[in-house]
Amino acid sequence: MPGTLFLIVGPSGVGKDTLLEGARDRLATSRWFSFPQRVVTRAADAGGEDYIPVTPSEFEQQLAAGAFWHQWHAHGLSYGIPMQVARDLDNGINVVLNASRNEIGAFRDKATHVVTIGISAPPGIVEERLHERGRESEEEIKRRLARLVEQAPLTGYALEIVNDRTIEEGITALVDLIAGACDLNAEITRFPVTIGSKQVCLVHKGNQIASRVLAGSSRVTLSLRGKSVSAELGETWSDEIVSQDLCALSEGAMAALDAVEGDVVSIERSPTPKSRSILQKKVRGGELSHAEMEAFIHDLVNGRFSTSEIAGFLVAASNNLTMDEVISLTQVRAAFAHRHDWGKAIVVDKHSMGGVPGNRITPIIIPILAAFGLTVPKTSSRAITSAAGTADMMEVLSRVDLSPDEMKSVVEQTNGCIAWNGNLTHSPVDDVMNAINRPLGLQSTLLDVSSIMSKKLAAGSTHVLIDMPVGPKAKTRTQGEAGALKNLFESVGQGIGLNTKVQISDGTKPIGRGVGPVLEALDVLSVLRGEAGAPTDLLDKSIGYAATILEWSGAVSQGQGAQVTRDLVSSGKAFEKLFEIRDAQGRQHDPLQPGQFTEDICADRSGRVEAIDIQGISEVARLSGAPKDKAAGVVLNVQVGDQIAEKQPLLRVHSSSLRGIEEAVCAAQAQSAFKIL
């Protein structure tokens, strides 16, 4: 951003030179200000301003050599402005220039940003000052006073100082006008701190521009090479942290700007969000239009709301969004994520509401569908409260942190992928909202559905099948809740043009044997290899869901899906496709080895397994170290309905550390997850 050209104008005797000299003493120590000397055909001992004296012939020589950016003639003298002024302005330096009011128009034609400051004083004070300096005769003083009275007031972008008080007060007034009219630029230095999810900008309290243009502001907008980010504003007197011409930015702010130390950033006070009235409308219970939702989310993502304002919106929206608002929020969230377009009439996806240990059907369904020939770009999350998410499990086989271009390449090669959504369909809206609602513990199906469906929309899907386990300890507790949530998903899907089908399933018990990334991967491979001991519940559920998708999407006739799906598994084509996807994403070469520390949890009595507490199983698996410890978790040795003997192993705990085993076993023994009658 170019610097500002300040033209200081005023007749003789008003104290212009004195004020300029004082302002220079206060500002010129900053790299962002320049007070160039004029070249004047005036004798060196003439007094007054600080100038470069030359003879008329010397002036003409410099003019011919191109030494002047601008020059003019007045009162029998020639004035030249050095070419360095143009270079300074181009480099963002603010130039303060002693100018003639007759040349204001010419300067405005040459510079991008020009501010004129007129210095004036009452005639009586001017006459007194002219007599005191003794440079003019009585006749000259009379002529100057006459011109002073005749001069028209300055117009157009002009500021004025009436210099009728003390010298210090006049200098302060001039510095205030100059510094307050500048754009604030600062060289970046790194501020090695992290304060939650907040970005931070720290400036020196002695920064003359910052102290004026940012006065009263607590947030600023930082801009660099077309990128911008909002940040919390901090101030310090410590030169060790940041000097007067620099700003210290937090790691997050630098990352958002793609900045390095030494870059020059533009700093502005963050404006009051235009959408604040929209926020207030929602908090009062009003309904937002699509345009209002779009404007609000835009300001939200750009950091223009405080934490308390965001919390206010989330509390209001958590239980008070109309269907149209949920649809609008979903569309706007997707617009902030990377949008994928596969150029296919049918692009299928499957999503699970989670909460059931194991249940790793996605890495089985995706290769089945891809082997058939459907396009299935699956993006999945990591675990938040469970022992493993689909991305955690897939990561033991291959890379999952794909870029959009890498994902496109994998899908073009194999028809499918199983990747982490953080780089692909995750919206920055989620980051802002999650940073507030997770600590608050806000539970909202309206916001959850909006988030889930926005990712499916961003992924370019046309058909989405949602697995909704229902059980007293699952995320969806009752059939009534499931019915309402099913209607919400399908209505939002219809509103955003996405074919959506919800399949309600049993959420009362684990699916499969392993719980934890490596242990679940071993189950998946066992099913796809067609091994005799593969978990039948995991196989049957995967076959059922894959068949539903094939029939629902029109890929096969009704009633044919199950047989087609089983053939793809038994022939080994689905297994081969999983390994194709694995290799295309980037194969992990570490062996699938469960944690070497193990301990069995055994039955304290004989009887029949009546129930298995899914939350209890998840807790034990997480205490063992999963999902961060990929090899940790539990293996279930029995299922609901099995007859067992006393001392029979119910599950085996795995961990890569002795501490993980101790904590998991302690929890398992304190409260058994198995109900045996």
Curated annotation (Swiss-Prot):
EC code(s) of this entry: 2.7.4.23, 2.4.2.4
EC class of the enzyme, as a word: transferase
Pathway: Metabolic intermediate biosynthesis; 5-phospho-alpha-D-ribose 1-diphosphate biosynthesis; 5-phospho-alpha-D-ribose 1-diphosphate from D-ribose 5-phosphate (route II): step 3/3
Reaction equations catalysed: alpha-D-ribose 1,5-bisphosphate + ATP = 5-phospho-alpha-D-ribose 1-diphosphate + ADP; thymidine + phosphate = 2-deoxy-alpha-D-ribose 1-phosphate + thymine
GO BP field: 5-phosphoribose 1-diphosphate biosynthetic process; organic phosphonate metabolic process; organic phosphonate transport; pyrimidine nucleobase metabolic process; pyrimidine nucleoside metabolic process
UniProt-listed InterPro entries: GK/Ca_channel_bsu (IPR008145), Glycosyl_Trfase_fam3 (IPR000312), Glycosyl_Trfase_fam3_N_dom (IPR017459), Glycosyl_Trfase_fam3_N_dom_sf (IPR036320), Guanylate_kin-like_dom (IPR008144), Nuc_phospho_transferase (IPR035902), P-loop_NTPase (IPR027417), PhnN (IPR012699)
Cellular component annotations (GO), alphabetically ordered: cytosol
A Pfam family: PYNP_C
Entry keywords, A to Z: Alkylphosphonate uptake, ATP-binding, Glycosyltransferase, Multifunctional enzyme, Nucleotide-binding, Transferase
Region Ribose 1,5-bisphosphokinase, annotated ranges: 1-187
Top-level lineage group: Bacteria
GO MF, one example: 1,4-alpha-oligoglucan phosphorylase activity
Region of interest called Thymidinephosphorylase, as start-end residue ranges on this chain: 188-677
NCBIfam families membership: ARCH_P_rylase (TIGR02645), phosphon_PhnN (TIGR02322), PRK04350.1 (NF003338)
PANTHER family: THYMIDINE PHOSPHORYLASE
Record family assignment: In the N-terminal section; belongs to the ribose 1,5-bisphosphokinase family. In the C-terminal section; belongs to the thymidine/pyrimidine-nucleoside phosphorylase family. Type 2 subfamily.
Function: Catalyzes the phosphorylation of ribose 1,5-bisphosphate to 5-phospho-D-ribosyl alpha-1-diphosphate (PRPP).
Name this polypeptide is given: Bifunctional ribose 1,5-bisphosphokinase-thymidine phosphorylase
Upper taxonomic lineage: Bacteria, Pseudomonadati, Pseudomonadota, Alphaproteobacteria, Rhodobacterales
